[in-house]
């Protein structure tokens, strides 16, 4: 599972997820990409589940790049605990995603295989995505 090795602070405030993706909106490494058109939060488990789905579909051919990293700690209080007594413990790590962000890239496989692999990956993710190629961008 992806998570930072160390952070300056253990917990973060919730924050707001507004605007378009300023960085990471171009295909930099591969030929094909999976681009977010919705906004939301993707957990480390979802990133890994999508990666596994793609890897299983393309078998041994091709290369995959993960362009997002879960660097935001999400805290949660235990069940049936009253409010107060401080912030809960870190439950999982997530990445804030804005529209326009490239989530995954792939090369070394035919376009049909890449398209199907990204469809399988998109089914594991909580936000709407679209298939993009380097030529279109």
Swiss-Prot record:
GO molecular function annotations of the record: rRNA binding; structural constituent of ribosome; tRNA binding
One Pfam family it belongs to: Ribosomal_L16
Composition-biased stretches (Basic residues): 1-17
InterPro entries: Ribosomal_uL16, Ribosomal_uL16_bact-type, Ribosomal_uL16_CS, Ribosomal_uL16_dom, Ribosomal_uL16_sf
CDD domains to which the protein is assigned, alphabetical: Ribosomal_L16_L10e (cd01433)
Keyword Hydrolase set for record: no
GO biological process terms held by the UniProt record: translation
Region (Disordered): 1-21
Keyword RNA-binding part of the UniProt annotation: yes
UniProt feature coiled coil, ranges: none
GO cellular component annotations of the record: cytosolic large ribosomal subunit
Family: Belongs to the universal ribosomal protein uL16 family.
Protein task: Binds 23S rRNA and is also seen to make contacts with the A and possibly P site tRNAs.
Summary of subunit composition and partner proteins: Part of the 50S ribosomal subunit.
Protein name as annotated: Large ribosomal subunit protein uL16
